[in-house]
Amino acid sequence: MRLLKRKSRTFEIQVQDMTLHIQAATDVDEESRAAALWFWELLHTYSIRNPEFRSSKRPVKVPGDAPEIVREIASTAARAGVGPMFSLQGAVTDHVGRFLAREVNEVTVNCGGDYFIRSRRRQKLTVLRRPGSSVAVVVPANRQGLGVSMTLGHGPKRSEVDGLAVLAESCMLAGAAAAGVQAILTKENGLHGALTYLKQVTGVIGGVVFLGERIGMAGGLELAA
């Protein structure tokens, strides 16, 4: 993804197996690193004691005394009908972004195809597709922060997505819904089913799916001029 027409300071932080790329107007390196490490450790500790949380492809129930980030992941993934494993990366991205948004008005956090974007202006995203073409979509101006999950296909199967972007109220939900889309695409009439699914998941704003020569759009996602 490429953010167009925006100037800001860019840096990256490494937390174990995660690399977060951050754009912000001010110096928030140390705050970003501390927040990312804190959220990662919460998830890592919980996952060690509850390995199903990191490996299940289906919704998992968690106890009421679990850390807030764990409960939020479980609830969000269940809303999309998938397992919490698909929202882990987006959760850290989300929570770091929300933490920084308390200090700065404009911030983007990117981790492996998951994006938290808070901006007072509309942003244009370049959504890539295999084998190299692209389309630009719009992320509306927002004060709370929105999530985007993007996937670039890499296989020859007819049911395998060539490119995918989901825009949602959170990065966690975008990642979970993107996983749901890819699962549905393997079924008969998969593209139609995937677009219907995106319209039905509460909190998903919209999505675009590239499947072979076909392009499908759902929800309120807007193509950029």
Predicted segment positions?
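Short, ordered loop/turn segments at secondary-structure junctions
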Residues: A25-D27, G113-D114, C171, G212-E213
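Flexible, glycine/charged-enriched surface loops at secondary-structure junctions
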Residues: I48-K61, N105-V107, G112, K187-A218
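Conserved short hydrophobic interaction patches
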Residues: F39-L42, Y46, G180-I184, Y197
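Conserved mixed alpha/beta catalytic, RNA-binding, or beta-rich assembly cores of soluble enzyme
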Residues: R71-V82, F86-V96, L100, V104-A194, ...
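An interfacial alpha-helical scaffold signature
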Residues: F39-R49, P59-V82, G132
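Conserved phosphate-binding loops in N-terminal lobes of ATP-dependent enzymes
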Residues: T19-E52
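Catalytic cores of large soluble enzymes that bind and process phosphate-bearing ligands
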Residues: D27-E31, A35, K61, D65, ...
